Swiss-Prot record:
Residues 35-51 have a biased composition (Basic residues). The gene is RPS2. Keywords: Acetylation, Citrullination, Cytoplasm, Isopeptide bond, Nucleus, Phosphoprotein, Ribonucleoprotein, Ribosomal protein, Ubl conjugation. This is Small ribosomal subunit protein uS5. GO terms for molecular function: RNA binding; structural constituent of ribosome. Pfam families: Ribosomal_S5 (PF00333), Ribosomal_S5_C (PF03719). PROSITE patterns: RIBOSOMAL_S5 (PS00585), S5_DSRBD (PS50881). It comes from Bos taurus (Bovine). The modification N6-acetyllysine is found at residues 263, 275. The modification Phosphothreonine is found at residues 252, 270. There is a cross-link at residue 275 (Glycyl lysine isopeptide (Lys-Gly) (interchain with G-Cter in SUMO1)). There is a cross-link at residues 54, 58, 275 (Glycyl lysine isopeptide (Lys-Gly) (interchain with G-Cter in ubiquitin)). The modification Phosphoserine is found at residues 264, 281. Residues 7-34 have a biased composition (Gly residues).
C-alpha cells in the first residue's frame, strides 16, 4: 500500500518521507521520477510476460545445430547427447525429450541487495530444482528484479543444466537400481555433501534440501553426510547437485571396455611371409692369415 501511495504522489512518493526507503527497495535513478519509472517498468514486465506466453504456443524454431538434429529426429534420446558431451544451449531440447515427465520445485527465493549511489538496489534470487524422478535432475539459479522473472529464468537454466544420474545397488543386484552406486562427494563453498549407498527400504536420510534433489533424481534409498555452513541453502543445493552429477564421472569394473587382443602383423601374416621368403646366400671372404713370430 505504501508503494502504491508513493507512485501516486502520496506521503511515500517522490520528495516525501518514504523516498529513501522506496528508493532503497527498487534502486531507481533520479529523485523526481523514481515512483513513476517503477510503475512503468512493472507494466512493461506484465506485457512481456503476456507476449512470452503467446510465444510459447508457437512452433519451436531451433537456432543451434543440435536443436535442428533433435527436431529432425536424427537424435533419438538425451543419452546420445550425453555420450558425446554436446553442450545443450536450448531448453526446448529438454522439453522435447522430457517435457511431459519434468517436475520443478522452487527451493528458495531470497532478496539480494547492491549498494548504489541512489540507495540499495534489491533483486530476487530464485533457486529451482527440476527432474523427472527417473534419472535426470537439474538445478538453476537466477537473479532478477521481479520474482516471477527470476523463477522463469531459473527454470530455463535448470533445464539447461540437467545431468544424467547413475543409480546402483547396495548389495545384490535384485530388482531395479535404487541407490547411488558408491560413495560420492560434492562441494560448493564450505559445504561438503557425501552420498552413501543404503539398503533397499531405508529411504533418503538427509536434510530437506538434498532430499528434494535426490528424490527428483530418482534415488529411493541413500544416506547423506554434510559439513560446513549448510544454512547457506544455495551452496547446500549446489554441493548436492555436484555430488549427484559425479555418479557418472568414474568407471566401475562392470563398465570397463572389454580388452580384445589382436595379433601383430608378423603373427597375422606368417603364412604370407613364409611363401615370399627368399634365401639370400652370403659369401664370406676369409681374410689372409697373418704370420706371427
Amino acid at each position: 500500500m505504501a508503494d502504491d501511495a508513493g507512485a501516486a504522489g502520496g506521503p511515500g512518493g517522490p520528495g516525501g518521507p518514504g523516498m529513501g526507503g522506496r528508493g532503497g527497495f527498487r534502486g531507481g535513478f533520479g529523485s523526481g521520477v523514481r515512483g513513476r519509472g517503477r510503475g512503468r517498468g512493472r507494466g512493461r514486465g506484465r506485457g512481456r510476460g503476456a507476449r512470452g506466453g503467446k510465444a510459447e504456443d508457437k512452433e519451436w524454431l531451433p537456432v543451434t545445430k543440435l536443436g535442428r538434429l533433435v527436431k529432425d529426429m536424427k537424435i533419438k534420446s538425451l543419452e546420445e547427447i550425453y555420450l558425446f558431451s554436446l553442450p545443450i544451449k536450448e531448453s526446448e531440447i529438454i522439453d522435447f525429450f522430457l517435457g511431459a515427465s519434468l517436475k520443478d520445485e522452487v527451493l528458495k527465493i531470497m532478496p539480494v541487495q547492491k549498494q548504489t549511489r541512489a540507495g540499495q538496489r534489491t533483486r530476487f534470487k530464485a533457486f529451482v530444482a527440476i527432474g523427472d524422478y527417473n534419472g535426470h535432475v537439474g538445478l538453476g539459479v537466477k537473479c532478477s528484479k521481479e520474482v516471477a522473472t527470476a523463477i522463469r529464468g531459473a527454470i530455463i537454466l535448470a533445464k539447461l543444466s540437467i545431468v544424467p544420474v547413475r543409480r546402483g545397488y547396495w548389495g545384490n543386484k535384485i530388482g531395479k537400481p535404487h541407490t547411488v552406486p558408491c560413495k560420492v562427494t560434492g562441494r560448493c563453498g564450505s559445504v561438503l555433501v557425501r552420498l552413501i549407498p543404503a539398503p533397499r527400504g531405508t529411504g533418503i536420510v538427509s536434510a530437506p534440501v538434498p532430499k528434494k534433489l535426490l528424490m527428483m533424481a530418482g534415488i529411493d534409498d541413500c544416506y547423506t553426510s554434510a559439513r560446513g555452513c549448510t544454512a547457506t541453502l544455495g551452496n547446500f543445493a549446489k554441493a548436492t547437485f555436484d555430488a549427484i552429477s559425479k555418479t557418472y564421472s568414474y568407471l566401475t569394473p562392470d563398465l570397463w571396455k572389454e580388452t580384445v587382443f589382436t595379433k601383430s602383423p608378423y603373427q597375422e601374416f606368417t603364412d604370407h611371409l613364409v611363401k615370399t621368403h627368399t634365401r639370400v646366400s652370403v659369401q664370406r671372404t676369409q681374410a689372409p692369415a697373418v704370420a706371427t713370430t
